[in-house]
Amino acid sequence: MRWTVLSTLAVFGVAACGSEKKGDASQTAAVATANAAPAPAAPAAVVEVKMTGDGTSKAAFEPATLTVKAGSVVRFINVSGGPHDIAFYTDSVPKGAVDALKKGMANTMGDLVGPFLTQPNEHYDVSFAGAPAGKYRGYCLPHVALGMHITITVQ
């Protein structure tokens, strides 16, 4: 009888130890799964466009044409001859692009019209995240008569 009790205790002891190891294994698997989370997405590429001019007879985007990948951010920088802004012709963007541009343009003065940049080195970012591929034609509202136009091709 004594052997039966000791044998029974030994079996329960082994079972208890075995269940602890199983718990440790499942905890290790849970930690490994948590550590295997995907890496955060790389930040969007930022492409700079200078806004220049003498304030009276010439004004330009530099460069006036550029190609960017979908998801890029175009940073418009007032270098000289401001105030400047960036506006896009709603009838000169790809089909479905108006809503994507509205999402990518914060603090607008109107549909697809960014704010005035009045100070040197002031900038305004336009995100092309979710924007369909194609040509986006834009202009600077105060200097459109001086030919300040830009074409951005999104690939």
PLM regions: where:
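Bacterial N-terminal signal peptides that target proteins for export
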Residues: 1-6
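Alpha-helical transmembrane segments
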Residues: 8-11
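C-terminal motif of bacterial Sec signal peptides marking the signal peptidase cleavage site
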Residues: 13-16
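Extracytoplasmic copper-binding redox domains, predominantly the cupredoxin/blue-copper superfamily
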Residues: 18-155
